[in-house]
Every structure is written in structure tokens, then in C-alpha cells.
């Protein structure tokens, strides 16, 4: 079983600030100048959606890092000489990484769906159509 240190290394935390910054800049841009007042802060839904979006983007970034580590290992791009990669260095087995990819994908999907539901104010019709179109778009890329 891989150590927590190996999983943190595979998740590459130094890549997270860029993803988080993109979401925070988008959130700041979404606020109108009248919203930026200490007297009247945005409503709780804004912060809920922001928090869920941040969680989603963190899961997606970690998922991308895991997938990159796995793919480079399988193709042979990362060999035993790459001690900075968790799979190539032998700290994480192929079976463990596959399981982590499934778990992280599932978490990202669930939190992403929750984000869409909150963002559309639980309007199930809009949410279902939006999620269907996103799924259709993703499947067309694949």
C-alpha cells in the first residue's frame, strides 16, 4: 500500500495554485462593481458555488496529474530514473493508481454535478439539459 507521501507526490500539489487562481479570477470577474461592498456581500449561494467549483477543479487537476503519471508509466516515458514520479519510482503500483483514477473521477463527477445543480438554483430541468449537453460534448471528444 502506497504511503500518503507518495499520493501527495503523485497529486503534484504545486500544480494546484494555477487551477485555483483561475477559478478565483473568474469569481471576481463575475461580481459587478456594486457587489464589491463590505456592507452587502454576495449571497450564500455564490460562496457555495465558488466552494464547489474550487473542489471540482482541485479534483480535476489531481485526476489529470494521476492520469499523466499513469500514462507516462505505461508508455515507458517515465522509467526508474524518474524518481520524481510515483509510479516510475515504484512507490505506487499500477493497480493502486487505476483505483485512484476511478475514485478521483467519480468524486470529480459527483462534485461537478452538485456544482451545476447549485449554480442553476436546483432547477432540475435546466440542470438535466446542461448535464446532458456537457456529457454529449465530452463523449464527442472521446
PLM features per residue range, with description:
Residues 1-9:
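Short, Lys/Arg-rich, polar N-terminal cytosolic tail immediately upstream
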Residues 8, 16-20, 47-55, 98-102, ...:
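Hydrophobic alpha-helical transmembrane segments
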Residues 25, 38-67, 129-140:
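Membrane-embedded alpha-helical segments that form the functional core of polytopic membrane enzymes
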Residues 59-83:
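Acidic (Asp/Glu-rich) catalytic motifs at the cytosolic membrane interface
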Residues 10-31, 106:
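The first (N-terminal) embedded transmembrane alpha-helix
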Residues 11, 72, 93:
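Residue-level signal for inorganic ion chemistry
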Residues 85-142:
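Intramembrane alpha-helical segments
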Residues 31-38, 69, 73-77, 117-121:
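Transmembrane helix-loop junctions in multipass membrane proteins, especially transporters and channels
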